[in-house]
Design a protein with these regions (language model features):
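Compositionally biased, proline/threonine/alanine/serine-rich low-complexity intrinsically disordered stretches
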Residues: 4-39
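N-terminal mature ectodomain segment of secretory-pathway/periplasmic proteins
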Residues: 40-138
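Gly/Pro-enriched, hydrophobic low-complexity segments
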Residues: 69-74, 106-111, 119, 125-277
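Hydrophobic transmembrane signal anchors and adjacent membrane-proximal interface regions, especially
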Residues: 10-11, 24, 38-40, 58, ...
């Protein structure tokens, strides 16, 4: 439904705030090519996804954003979580990892999580994330190193921190799209005129009318920022029971995105004096 677009959650930015940053070109990473033969409704969507991935890998080194997420976990939909995120995209030259995938997160809402901080850097800290709790718990619990896919780190989460970020989202969309492309029962629509926090987006809507074991969702919407050429929101819904609304599986919205802000190792260092590890 259109209600997504005008959700009060997606607060307006200050008028005139412009998010583009100068584009910095780096060595291109190989991106697999999209299928040529246009014989499945998903093909135009896959072409957009491959182009977006190429753009991310060629032109976007890092970004900061507010991530707002809700997920169906342990039988219920979580409340909205707001996180300030800094992400440095993985960069490879030949077979060498030039820049490891790096994430810093600070939780802003809800109150019980406010102040929680998490850092993950690929190939560092023996593969572990470093975290400390926020809220009341944060006052007496120590900073811990955790396996990203272990039970503690995954509590209340659908996916590990290693899956976070816009590039990972695009990779997942391509994987889902290529898998769904092997089957029929799929309708794809492009809807113009949507806005996410005042920014023009095109919505890619994918529906699988009939529930099948090989489909992940009944309906998914990808909001692509027309200027930034990257997805800024993904929402997926399961099949509704008779007369019910389609239940939410997961939704992720990136707001206040600032590209190529020049993040450094210090942004992903637990000893950063601006952090509370």
């Amino acid at each position: 439904g259109g209600s997504l677009v005008t959700s009060p959650l997606l607060a307006q930015e200050k008028p005139g705030e412009h998010l583009t940053q100068p584009v910095i070109h780096v060595a291109k990473n190989d991106v697999p090519q999209a299928p040529i033969q246009p014989n499945h409704p998903l093909d135009p969507a896959l072409r957009i996804a491959y182009a977006s991935l190429q753009h991310l890998r060629s032109n976007i080194n890092d970004y900061s954003a507010i991530l707002i997420k809700r997920e169906f976990v342990n039988g219920a939909v979580s409340e909205y979580e707001y996180m300030g995120v800094k992400v440095r995209n993985r960069k490879v030259s030949g077979n060498n990892l030039v820049t490891p995938f790096s994430v810093y997160m600070t939780f802003l809402k809800p109150a019980a999580m406010k102040g929680r901080e998490v850092i993950y850097v690929e190939n560092a800290n023996k593969g572990k994330l470093v975290a400390h709790e926020g809220g009341m718990k944060g006052r007496f619990l120590p900073t811990v190193d955790l396996d990203p896919t272990g039970m503690l780190a995954m509590r209340g989460q659908r996916y590990p921190i290693t899956d976070i970020g816009i590039e990972n989202l695009v990779v997942k969309l391509i994987e889902k799209g290529e898998r769904d492309r092997k089957h029929g029962e799929c309708t794809v629509d492009f809807i113009q005129g949507a806005k996410i926090s005042g920014r023009d987006c095109t919505v890619l809507s994918v529906k699988h009318p009939v529930q099948r074991p090989y489909f992940d969702f009944h309906h998914a919407q990808v909001f692509i920022d027309n200027e930034l050429q990257i997805p800024v929101r993904y929402a997926a819904y399961s099949w509704p029971t008779a007369g019910e609304k389609a239940p939410l599986l997961e939704e992720y919205t990136y707001q206040n995105i600032k590209l190529n802000v020049g993040l450094t190792d210090a942004d992903f260092d637990r000893d950063n004096p601006n952090y509370s590890f």
